[in-house]
């Protein structure tokens, strides 16, 4: 029995040796060779994409647990979907414990990389770019994990998404860090998700920099427990180019950080500059809804110590010019609609619309300087962020 147990231990410890490396090179037949590797891979395998440009005409998919797809760098390995037929994602992942790292996608007809129901997924140094710049015909999302527990996005860069560059939806235990979101409608969006940490990112030249939303009518609602900290949110002044009907089509040009209908959000230690509508905006959901489960108010939102530069000087709001004149040339950095519950450290410059119910028109506002209580005690950070073991895959 002792010998059998020892043998079993040795066999188990040797299991990783069985993992295979599938190396793919650019050139003729790359589409078929790469998709075949994604289909035939076994758990623990690594698919290596050598440096070069891969001309692809169809989307790719991965449905095997525990696979790593590794390129030669976000500027070294480029999956070029300019000639893609159809309108699907560049890459769809529907399996757990997947690591995607060090490669780029350009010009997918639909989303860049979508992972659905893919728990413990890592996006590391991934780039998604629509090379024609802001355009409503671009794909909606660059990096798009949804319905997942355990999401790490680290060192990514997304440019040109017609909805959100980095979007995490209906998920739990999330970290988005060290990433750049530029010239998208929404730079980074956390939607209907809990326990998210958004830190050390750059959000610039988007319509809105960082959005934390909760929307009705989705399978997962009740977003909250989110920290937005240590980010550079600057010059988010791109005209909104979302297709009509998208929820982000209502985001005002010049929004820095926006919280809508979440419960428990901390905004601290960010540098927020040159966002002409509002450096920080905290509001209730503005549209009609029928879902009885839905809670539309921003609750327990805490604005901590942030660095505010220029902003609020060209607000895309009804009566914006009169508001600017009334406040002496620019609106204070923190804008609250007056609904729900907001806390801010002493001395936080801000203003309130003093609305009385969700969906009230801005013309019914009674603008006044911000008058909210200071936060009571420390923000509860427990359980926020991706599981620590996801970091081990990128070390």
Model features per residue range: what roles?
Residues 288, 293-395:
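Acidic, glycine- and Ser/Thr-rich low-complexity intrinsically disordered tracts
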Residues 34-40, 55-64, 69, 80, ...:
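Short, T/G/N/S-enriched strand-turn elements that build extracellular solenoid repeat scaffolds
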Residues 6-7, 17:
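Cleavable N-terminal signal peptides
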Residues 31-35, 57, 81-91, 107-114, ...:
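Extracellular beta-strand/beta-solenoid scaffold signature
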